[in-house]
Amino acid sequence: PYIFLIATFGSSPGYCCGYLADLIESKGFGVSAKFSILMVDTWTPVFNLSNEDKINKKTLTSDKQIGDVISKIERKEPGDFVKRKLPKFVCDIFRKITTSYRKTSHLNVDDKCVGCGLCRKSCPVKAIDLQMKKPVWVKNECVMCLRCLHLCPKFAIQYDNKTQNHGQYLNPHISSLD
C-alpha cells in the first residue's frame, strides 16, 4: 500500500516523520512518502501571532504547499519531501530539554474567563476540568497544543506571562473541532 506521512510545523518538523516511519516499519510496513507543510507557529510563549498580514501570508503559503502535497499523494509519488528536518539525536535531546514546557502549572486563567467550558471540551488529552465555572488543569502535563488558549473567546488563558501580547490563532479552514 501507498503509506504517506505529513508533518505540519511552524519552525521545524524536527524528526517526527522519522519517528513515525520507524514505528510503521517495525510493524512490517514501509513508508512510501514523507511530507512537511510549513504553517503558522501557534506556540505563542515564543511566537507572536498579532500581525495579521504576516499570518495571512503564511497561510497562503501553507495552502499552496497543501495543494502540492495533495497532487503528489494523488500520483502516489514516493520520496522524502520533508523540509527543515533535524537529525534524530538533536530531537531526542530537545525532547528531554522541553519536558518541563509541558507542565500544566505554566497555564493560568484570569478574571476575563466567563466559564463557557470550551477549553475543557476541546482539550485533546482531557487535562482540564471546570470547577466553580473556571478551568482547572487536572493533569500535571499535557501535550501543550495550546488549543485552550487559542480557542478561549475572552483570551483568558495564558502561558505564564509570555502570551498576553502574542495573540491567538484559529485556522481559517477549520470550522469544527470534532
Where would I find each of the regions flagged by the language model?
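FMN-binding flavodoxin-like domain, especially the glycine-rich phosphate-binding loop
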Residues: 1-97, 167
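Short amphipathic alpha-helical segments at helix-loop
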Residues: 50-54, 101, 105, 134
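A mid-sequence, solvent-exposed acidic-amphipathic segment
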Residues: 85-117, 121-124
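Iron-sulfur cluster-binding cysteine motifs and their immediate structural context
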Residues: 108-109, 114, 118-137, 147-164
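Active-site-proximal loop/hinge segments that shape catalytic or ion-binding/gating pockets
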Residues: 169-177
